[in-house]
Amino acid sequence: MNQQTELKDSSNESNPTRFGLPRQAIKEIQDALALYPEVEKAILYGSRATGTFKPESDIDLTLIGENLTHNHLLGIMFDLDDLLLPWMIDLSLLDTIDNPGLREHIGRVGQTLYER
């Protein structure tokens, strides 16, 4: 069963969440990730996680999953691109990030956007 990040309740679907993204956009991203059983968790980091985003800020996501490969990453990237969202999505696999500063940043400010 999927557990998805609880978002602010709002009667207007276009109201941004605390990540500065409409509820519908987050749901579409979560639904795309749910198509891949290898994705155990998706962590949002960067300006959208810290609350310092601008309307045009990208969406920084790193994926966690024991069996995730670069081929999965490519498929997910294509599926997210097909959503035609107005933001660039910077997608990575946490296990392949070599930059210790970036890993520390993700650990410190990362917010769970999706969890299987």
What do the PLM-derived regions correspond to, one by one?
Residues 45-47:
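Glycine-rich beta-strand-to-loop/alpha-helix junction loops that act as flexible
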